[in-house]
Amino acid sequence: MPRSTNKGPFVDHHLMKKVDQAQKEGSKRPIKTWSRRSMVVPEMVGLTIAIHNGRQHVPVYISENMVGHKLGEFAITRTFRAHSGDRKAKKEGEK
């Protein structure tokens, strides 16, 4: 069930404070955050936010298309290891 429109978007206070400060200074340095649950708001457009994926901080440049989505959507947490193929079929194809 989606969040009520009466409440508005959720953004952690500490993250919003850093966003406001970066906009005042015109800083291009990435803002480090662990808050994957925060929603992207129009004030963040043009900033680079380093989102934690459980292991490291992934730098993400915020564009207008991202507004309304959660930060966690842009920093994947799982790495895909390809399934091992049929070795016998590979060897026959090489011959």
Curated annotation (Swiss-Prot):
SUPFAM superfamilies: Ribosomal protein S19. Keywords: Ribonucleoprotein, Ribosomal protein, RNA-binding, rRNA-binding. GO terms for cellular component: cytoplasm; small ribosomal subunit. One of its GO terms (biological process) is translation. One of its GO terms (molecular function) is rRNA binding. Pfam families: Ribosomal_S19. Belongs to the universal ribosomal protein uS19 family. PANTHER family: RIBOSOMAL PROTEIN S19P FAMILY MEMBER, SMALL RIBOSOMAL SUBUNIT PROTEIN US19M. Protein S19 forms a complex with S13 that binds strongly to the 16S ribosomal RNA. This is Small ribosomal subunit protein uS19.
